[in-house]
């Protein structure tokens, strides 16, 4: 399988800085791709720091597996790898926050698509979304991980 990846981000018209990070890796064999998007929380200092920390942690954690390190490619093993990657990202953000009072409220959304052959494994936190685009149709693959979404689903 051959992957073609491109990424672009724009700060928008409201923010003074771009707090988004888009990054990816494709292994040498061309059968796996890791796609990562993070959107720092606007309105708080350090969103760009949190999003960069999160993306770097995910890539650091998962790159050995996509590069061909021995790993069990079952859904359970993939889920475990993704959970560890998200935990590492969270740990890095928490550690950085605790070292700088100005960054105490920094945070980020995070979306990861780990594509193996023709199957995508998606993990996310926050309200950044992952879509599947086929035949000019976009289908949302994620559910917003927010208080508002929970209230809507609960009928609150």
Residue spans of the language-model regions?
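PP2C/PPM-type serine/threonine phosphatase catalytic domain
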Residues: 1-156
């Amino acid at each position: 399988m051959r992957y073609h990846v491109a990424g672009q981000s724009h700060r928008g018209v409201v923010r003074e800085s771009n707090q988004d990070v888009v990054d990816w890796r494709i292994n040498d064999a061309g059968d796996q791709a890791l796609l990562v998007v993070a959107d720092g929380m606007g309105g708080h200092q350090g969103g760009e720091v949190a999003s960069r920390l999160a993306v770097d942690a995910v890539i650091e954690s998962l790159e050995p597996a996509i590069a061909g390190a021995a790993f069990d490619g079952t859904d359970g093993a993939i889920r475990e790898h993704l959970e560890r990657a998200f935990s590492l990202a969270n740990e890095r953000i928490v550690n950085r926050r605790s070292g700088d009072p100005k960054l105490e409220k920094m945070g980020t959304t995070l979306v990861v698509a780990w594509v193996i052959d023709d199957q995508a494994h998606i993990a996310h936190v926050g309200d950044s979304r992952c879509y599947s685009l086929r035949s000019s149709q976009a289908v949302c693959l994620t559910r917003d991980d927010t208080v508002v979404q929970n209230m809507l689903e609960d009928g609150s």
